[in-house]
């Protein structure tokens, strides 16, 4: 067997092994108590994040959730502009599976049919206007809202929640968001 084949097989094995790991957060990790999935559906503007490297220079980031064909599947459309408001629009279409029926706060986000990542709704406001999506590895976090801009007090309260989860909030990046009237990507 050639070295390239061995490396490919090892990578496939690693992906399968990682995607099969438990996605449940450890006991005590903050999760929203009872997420009403129908109310959670719709557009969420990413206000701030500790992003994956792919979106570290994103503008106008939006996650759109819609219910899938079965009760536990969520269709996701993630869009952003690369490098500026006039940058190339990028779109990703992962899907999510709801893993915990009682709270609906733990999802597995599926990418490319082989990769599953933990997605924890750690907080959603009572009016479903703001949310925090976290991971117990504390590698990524998203502060999102139903509008592209938050007032300073609301934003700071969400940053404080992120800090309480255990994240280094100095790593948060505010995502530039244009007013809705200036956008052509909705």
Q: How should each PLM-predicted stretch be described?
A:
Residues 1-10:
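Bacterial N-terminal signal peptides that target proteins for export
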Residues 1, 18-21:
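Intrinsically disordered, low-complexity segments enriched in Ser/Pro/Gly/Ala and basic residues
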Residues 21-186:
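A beta-rich soluble binding module of mature secreted/lumenal proteins
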Residues 9-19:
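Bacterial N-terminal signal peptides
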